[in-house]
Amino acid sequence: LQEAKIGPMPVLPDVSRYQAPESVVPRNDLVQKAAQLLSTARSPAILAGRVSRSEAGWKARIALAERLQARVFTDIKTPAAFPTDHPLHAAPPATFPDGKLLRDADVVLSLDWVDTAGTLKAAWGDAPIGAKVIRVSVDAHIHRGWSADYQGLPPADAYLMCEPDVAVPLLLEAVRPRAAAVQSRPESSKDEDKAVSIRALARAFNELTEGMDVCLSKLPLGWNGAYRHFRHPLDYLGADGGGGVGAGPGLTVGAALALKGSGRMVVGIVGDGDFLMGNTALWTATHYKLPCLILVANNRSFYNDEMHQERVARERGRPVENKWIGQRIDEPDIDLAAMARAQGAAGIGPVKELSRLKPSLADALEYVKKGEVCVVDVRVMPGYDAPVSGGAASARR
């Protein structure tokens, strides 16, 4: 086929006959049932999950939350779905929502949330789910016996089998306003950074990008959702679907292609393992002139597996000191900045001192503003400031 001669051009079909179908609209009685549950709730909650990048959809979700005075939870695995600095945003986006806050709800509206069943189970444990549940999702289309890609089957007192962007305006029109006092949220920690950490990296980055339109294409596992606010549907694009290592650079370059010329700077904050497994995507970015910035939160380890190996060692009575074996990326050290330069990108680092962090990031931002690709190797302390397995934040090694 590759060597075959090209014959006459075929007649091109009328593409208007192959359009995507219109979104399904749920039955009115189901909308009214859901609206009644929400309107009469004592403490409604919204799980804002997989939604579109539409600004109209973003505004509709805000309007619905404000009309209901509902607490809103967002997921660090999915793209920005609600302004995280809004008074109704219950807690920083996380892999697992705050179970106590969720248990306070008597009605839960799940907007295509990833693993609603697992989230409710984590909040209520073995007890019956104490809240009425309204599901808005098209997940049931993939339910079958062959696989379990769709996670557990959650309870649903009303199921609107449509996309959230379709359901939210219908609910907004049908619900009655609720009067409720908005509870204040605890302030984020203002402790001074004493070493280069992911938190220090986030603070320096936030200061330097204040007022800029930035799209975060990827965040590392140790990122705490409180580190940066999301105020637009393109502020954050979510995590890779399966949690695989190596997606970060490619996701960043792909986002840079999609947003080229938009005025929004694409930034991927990735781990060193993620960068090492996918860094050849940089060549595509430099070849096609797709400006973007990759900040490598480099803890010199596949650290998530160090945590797993530590837990297994404790459970089996084995030496915890061996947790690094097969995971530590050291001896020899890898020059990540040189790997970037080898592909035509600017490479900065390794940045090991706190005093060099902000100037290095400032230089990197200037490269990207000039239309270049830049990578900064930031040597962060090992450890996570965010729970990644349903438990407490992980200790440093």
Where are the model-predicted features located?
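Glycine-rich phosphate/diphosphate-binding loops that line cofactor/substrate pockets in enzymes
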Residues: 30-44, 64-67, 102-104, 204-211, ...
